[in-house]
């Protein structure tokens, strides 16, 4: 299994890199390719099983878009060919039409608007397929997109225009949920690995599932989640 982690030096703002550390620990002989700025992405000339990018400071988003723009058609081709993509935090905004007046890759019909006077922080409980997904959001930007919903919001906040959160198209998974999403949601991690058709052993059992059950029970106990903004 080959994972390409794009621009890991700037796209692990909330510890998102632990998604890849955990995923790679579950699969024998997993190779992680780290692509930095001004390097040709590995996916351009080689087969990869998963392309990953995590949360970043807003000032780096244009740099990331500029780096990926020459490979836009290749990225679209890989998405259509069902290569797996996982984008956490504001990384998903890169693939939309725009972030304010910054032109995005325009792969998905989404638009993000920043509001630096309104830093959103909240817990999240949602549903994908028959799985409950727990997580956390922290962002200055708000996305409008009514196509290809990933998760249905049960408690918390999704996209601006409805009760959905994230983008799911073919094997592209993009969500505003930050940090070690895969550690927090071992059920989704297992689902992802099964979809990728690789041999795996979910690490740190039963601790990760016990922690998930405790967090899920806690989240279910709240009537709703409030937004903390500063």
Language-model features, listed with the residues they occupy:
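Pocket-forming structural segment of enzyme catalytic cores
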Residues: 101-166
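A glycine-centered loop/beta-turn motif at secondary-structure junctions
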Residues: 161-197
